[in-house]
Structures are given as C-alpha cells and as structure tokens.
Amino acid sequence: MDEYDELYVYTMGRKNFILQHVVDAHIAQSAAAANPPAIGVIFALVGLYLHVEKGFTGTQVQNAHRVMAKKKRSWPDVVWPTERGDMTPATVLAIPGGQARDQAIDAWCKEVWSAFSANRSMVASLIDEYEIG
C-alpha cells in the first residue's frame, strides 16, 4: 500500500467526509497535464476551490460533483502549473492521526489549490454555471 492509499484508508469514516479532499488534492497534484483535461481533474479543481475558498465539507463537495455530473459537456482547458506543491500524502501521514492530520489535509489542499490558482476564474465560472454554492 502506498502513502496515498494509506491516507485514503485513514480518512474513510472521518468526520465531514474529508476523504473527498484527499482524492481531489491527489488527482490535481498527480494528473498528467493534458487538454482537454479529464473530467476528474475538473472535478478535483472544483472540489479544491469549494473547500479552500468556500469552506465546503467533503460531503458538500461530493454533492457539487453530483450536480456537475448530470450535465454532459466539454470541459475548459486547464492551466497546468509547473510545480503543484511540496506537500504529499507522505507529508500528511507524517503528522499524528487525529485533528492535526486532518488539518494537514487542509493545508495540502490549500497548497495544491494555490499551485492551480491560474484556473480560479475558470472554476468560479463553472460554479456559477452549475449554480453551486
């Protein structure tokens, strides 16, 4: 089991479905740069935006993803950053389990979202289009 899988298992059943934030940060940080992007990348960026900027819980992010999945469309291109943050699942796992590790997950999300900040207006437009938030 690699560090991502271990962190994934750790978050299963944690309060507010923080597993969703782990999935979103990991997808955005590790996806191959390609345009048009895979739907998972768009959903990950939307999830990070909603969590970091709007304070959405993992459950609320998952519900937003459900709304977006109902309408098929082509997705806008992503501006791919050269660096996507220094934190990784291994960094997060180095923090003792519990509230401190959960806060480290939030810090990881913030770092990855910051790396993708050139996509903020595109993501905000999608949020408006789907009337989320």
Region spans (language model):
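Intrinsically disordered, low-complexity linkers and terminal regions
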Residues: 2-133
